[in-house]
Amino acid sequence: MQWTDGKIRCHWVSPTNTTYLRYHDEEWGRPVHDDQLLFEMLILENFQAGLTWECVLNKREAFRRAFDEFDLRKVASYSEEKLTALQADSGIIRNRLKIRAAVVNAQVFQKIQQEWGSFDRYLWHWTDEKSIQEVDKVSSPLSDAISKDLKKRGMKFVGTVIIYAYLQAVGVINSHESGCFLNPLQQ
């Protein structure tokens, strides 16, 4: 479907949700190499488990406020009082297990940074620093392998489907559909 701006986009983009539209046009599938943003997207994807990405994306600013702008050091050291406050924050998804997982995942993220020099190096080494183009999948051998490794390291809510969505979000996998103006084969 061609939009009023003359562009063709992936079928899942809602023309009525400008947040979702901007996300598709400006973020999704674009390679991310900044550890701060890689951490933010990982935590947001963790909260997506069992929900729609649109639901999480619509709460993104509230998540940023609640999670101290996704400051890795702060999140990794959250106290019980902070966790209780997060569970009471109606602006975010208040799942107790996901909130606690954010702290554990922040701690593991830090350990990976220490081991690899950055989370970026760890993540992109799986593809030799290259984006992969694939569409119409929800998991792959790549997401299986990364999911398995992250679980072994202690991360939570990092099943293969969540990791695949994460890889798409941060541009390791570009899943813009054939015809979409952001599909690399269209450019």
What residues fall within each predicted segment?
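HhH-family (HhH-GPD) DNA N-glycosylase catalytic core used in base-excision repair
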Residues: 1-187
